[in-house]
Amino acid sequence: MVTSSKGQIEELLATILQHSTAEDEEVLLHLLNGIHDKQQGIHRRYINAALHMVGNFEPDSSEVRIPITPVIHNTIKVPHGGIIATIADAAMGGLASRSVPAGFNVVTTNINVSYIATTTNKELIARGRFVHKGRQTLVMECDIEDETGRKLAIATASFFVIQRRQS
């Protein structure tokens, strides 16, 4: 019995690769590349690394993109609704957190997603913007599309301003 994490990982990877399908290997490579990107400082959070999330934030708008791969598929092989909610939260929350004064951050207090369509295309794109900027509460909205411009969902969310925790 191997007791180190590295040994357990090596054994598990060997077992997985012995029985892997091409899709298993695609997913594993995707996830390992995400961890590698985090180690290289490209991502700060594992969720962003695992999803290969890329964001662009302007003062009043944001755009977050993730590739559509089997990692995010549901049982009918389209992006899972929870992933669509996650990318919307990242676009809105990332924009909200950048708008508050130094020493503060935001937490999501409510999110609502209305799903409109599915896609089998290559990329999810979430575009966030402000509806209301208060001292303690921010209200945001977001459109989620694929790379062809097909609207997949719309989301709204509320964020509460909190003092940033000391690391």
Describe the residue ranges of each PLM region.
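Terminal targeting signals and extreme-terminal segments of soluble enzymes
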Residues: 1-125, 131-167
